[in-house]
Structures are given as C-alpha cells and as structure tokens.
C-alpha cells in the first residue's frame, strides 16, 4: 500500500515513532481486525484502531446502547441510549466520522461457535471485547486452530486482565484457565460494578498490543498475563508459559468450537 499525502499528514506522528515508521503504517493500513463485542473494551479499541488507520474493522455485537453504558463505553452518547440504537450501527457511524478511509463492517449478532469462522474470515487479528469466558474460549479455540492471533482482556470492578495470544509462540487462554468459571462465580459488571477509567486504560493497552501485531512487530508484545487493580494501582505480570497439558494448543482439541 502506498501512502497518500493525506495519509502522510494524518499518521505523521504515529510514523515518527520509530518502532512503527512508514513500513509499519503501511502494514497497519493493509490489515483487518475483528472486534468481538463493542461495549466497554471494544468501543475504545475500535476507535483507537480506526484513528491508527487499520484498513478494515469488523465489529460484532447484538446489544443496544443503554444509559448505563455511557460512563465507560466510547463512541456512544445519550441520544444513542435514548433511541436504544444497536451498538454496531452507532459505532460504525462514529467510526466513519473519525476516519472515513477505514472500512467498517457492522455485524449485529452475538459471536458463537457457529459464526466465528465467517466473522474472522480474512482478518489478521481478533480483539476480545466480550463480557464472558465462554465466548473467549470459542475465540481461543478458533485462534489456535487457524493460527490467528488474538488479544484477551477483561475488566470487572477495578480489576483488569490482559494477555496477547500468538498461536505456536505464546500460551493460549486454556493454558492459563482450565475451563470457563461457573456463571455463578464469574462476577459481571452488572453485579460488581466497573470503574470507567479501568476500561479505557486496559483497552488502550489492548490496542497497543494489536498495533504491534498488525505493524509486523509481534516480537514486541508483552508475553505475560498482566493484572492491574486500578483502584490500588497494583500491577502483576504473571509468566504465561505454554502448558504441556493444554488440551487446546498442545492436544489439538477444540471443544468450544465443536460444542
């Protein structure tokens, strides 16, 4: 992809960062990413990737904008909530205003084992904007089976987690978590609440990892499970070694795709 004069100006400061440069920017503009869920995490990631010039974004979510979303979710406003606009349609409209050169494909549906392949087809990366571990395990199985990188993240209350997964190189989600936690023990934002800045900050970190991969610099990712408490400012970086007993990346069992 050649850089136009407008591109040279729009992305000038990003290209001036030597780790990206012109070659990295061209790679970013030629890349595609699937964002599964455009709520708290996904809305911010979508905006940041669009501003960074990612060529094509597929956004998938079946939810509508609610007033309780506004304190932590980017792209949406009170008018969207009043009209109960589908998130993907509201998001697509805002993203077009931010960067009309980015192709945005809005899919008003919930990602599952039956549609993840069609959603991810032709993409270079999956970004986790979901709110449940079952969907994350589906994404993980697809990622490992088809060697497609993805970035796990989640926030509840003030506690956030982040881990990039590059098949054949890093641990996968099932190396770390044997199974999705039971629904009764997995608190949600509805039950435990959520700190808005925690969501925006971990989404920015997710986006930075995504840009490393899309710019051809996956060597620079942070190969850890990072945990941050945004209320106490405690940060943990936990080694995320490949588990020799992992049924997914080591055993080749993709149970959550087959379910």
Locate each region found by the language model:
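Adenine nucleotide-associated cytosolic modules
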Residues: 1-259
């Amino acid at each position: 992809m050649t850089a136009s004069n407008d591109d040279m100006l729009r992305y000038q400061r990003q290209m001036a960062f030597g780790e990206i440069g012109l070659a990295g920017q061209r790679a970013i503009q030629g890349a595609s990413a699937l964002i599964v869920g455009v709520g708290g995490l996904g809305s911010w990631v979508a905006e940041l990737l669009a501003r960074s010039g990612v060529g094509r974004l597929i956004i998938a979510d079946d939810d509508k904008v609610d007033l309780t979303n506004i304190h932590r979710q980017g792209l949406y406003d009170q008018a969207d909530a009043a009209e109960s606009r589908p998130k993907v349609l509201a998001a697509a409209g805002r993203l077009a205003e931010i960067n009309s050169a980015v192709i945005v494909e809005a899919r008003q549906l919930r990602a599952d084992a039956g549609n993840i392949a069609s959603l991810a087809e032709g993409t270079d990366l999956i970004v986790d904007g979901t709110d449940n571990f079952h969907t994350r395990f589906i994404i993980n199985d697809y990622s490992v089976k088809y060697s497609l990188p993805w970035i796990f993240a989640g926030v509840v209350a003030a506690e956030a987690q982040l881990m990039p997964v590059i098949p054949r190189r890093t641990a996968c989600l099932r190396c770390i978590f044997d199974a999705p936690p039971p629904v009764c023990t997995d608190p949600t934002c509805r039950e435990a609440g959520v700190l808005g800045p925690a969501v925006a900050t971990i989404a920015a970190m997710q986006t930075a990892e995504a840009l490393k991969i899309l710019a051809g610099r996956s060597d620079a990712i942070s190969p850890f499970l990072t945990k941050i408490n945004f209320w106490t400012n405690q940060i943990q970086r936990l080694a995320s070694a490949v588990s020799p007993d992992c049924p997914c990346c080591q055993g080749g069992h993709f149970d959550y795709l087959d379910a």
